[in-house]
Curated annotation (Swiss-Prot):
Locus of motif Nuclear localization signal: 48-69, 95-101
Gene (name only): C9
The CRESS-DNA virus Rep endonuclease domain, residue ranges: 1-95
Catalytic residues in the record: Y78
Cofactor(s) of this protein: Mg(2+); Mn(2+)
Organism: Faba bean necrotic yellows C9 alphasatellite (FBNYC9A)
Residues reported to bind ATP: G178, K179, S180
Stated name of the protein: Para-Rep C9
Length: 281
């Protein structure tokens, strides 16, 4: 018998067992209870189906296991009931509800045959999953390097309210100044979109997925002569139109930050000088 969702009881005497889970586990919640004796009552949701012995090894301590009969929400609530609680509850990971978007993605990428049957959906699901994992790591750990003074300056500017004119232009001609690392870090935030430059239609297509996002444009040195000033002005003016695959567009009231990371200075024949705030690396 194999399943994704399980309920478990772990009897013990003495110190409360410390449960530790790995990447095979999507979500778990448990607490110390006492009725006639001390035990851990819990729920575990795996990323893919597993047999009982495997789940026992994941939890440790030879727990009593049962395949979940109701919904994961009901089981999770029961595992956190107050009546018999001594300590806890404690949790691990993120609960995936049945029918949720994230659950569908996880189910799609679990079966390699989907790569052949639905290659476009499979690739998008893989990309979404990898991005979601990277976002969690960024949220937990913060920027993984010591901040340069210019990075601290930019972070200070981003804490201010954006306006409808200023584009923050980070200029570093030499390379190895932390621009791309910093840009990717910002791009992992949920209210930011990271773009490595490109054509207007390609970038507006990406932006339409989250049109209220702040935009980070990290321009590779080899593309410096093809800087897309049209896109910068469009998104700063909050007029976003994409004709890629299907026509879609919107005029938005919110103001956003636009950050350009480049090895060159802006061309003032192509963009108004009063729009640009230069930060030197």
């Amino acid at each position: 018998m194999s399943a994704v969702n399980w309920v478990f009881t772990l009897n013990f005497a003495g110190e409360v067992p410390v449960l530790s889970f790995d990447e095979r586990v999507q979500y778990a919640v448990w607490q110390h209870e006492r009725v006639n004796h001390d035990h851990i009552q819990g729920v575990i949701q795996l990323k893919k189906k597993a047999k009982m012995n495997t789940v026992k090894n994941i939890i440790g301590g030879n727990p009593h296991l049962e395949k979940m009969k109701g919904s994961i929400e009901e089981a999770s609530a029961y595992a956190q009931k107050e009546e018999s609680r001594v300590a806890g509850p404690w949790s691990y990971g993120e609960l995936l509800k049945k029918g949720s978007h994230k659950r569908k993605i996880m189910e799609l990428i679990k079966d390699p045959e989907n790569e052949l049957e639905e290659p476009q959906k499979y690739r998008r699901a893989m990309a979404w999953s990898a991005m979601d994992e990277s976002r969690k790591l960024a949220e937990e750990g913060g920027f993984p390097y010591t901040l340069y003074s210019w990075q601290e300056t930019v972070l200070g500017l981003l804490e201010e309210e954006p306006n409808d004119r200023i584009i923050i232009w980070v200029y570093g001609p030499n390379g190895n100044e932390g621009k791309s690392q910093f840009g990717k870090f910002l791009g992992l935030k949920k209210d930011y979109l990271y773009l490595p430059g490109g054509k207007t239609q390609d970038m507006t297509y990406m932006l339409m997925k989250n049109p209220k996002a702040n935009v980070v444009m990290d321009i590779p040195r080899c593309n410096s002569e093809y800087l897309n000033y049209q896109f910068m002005e469009l998104i700063k003016n909050r007029t976003i139109f994409s004709y890629k695959y299907e026509p879609v567009g919107c005029i938005i009231n919110n103001k956003i930050h636009v950050i350009v990371l480049a090895n060159v200075l802006p061309d003032y024949e192509k963009i108004s000088q009063d729009r640009i705030k230069i930060i030197y690396c």
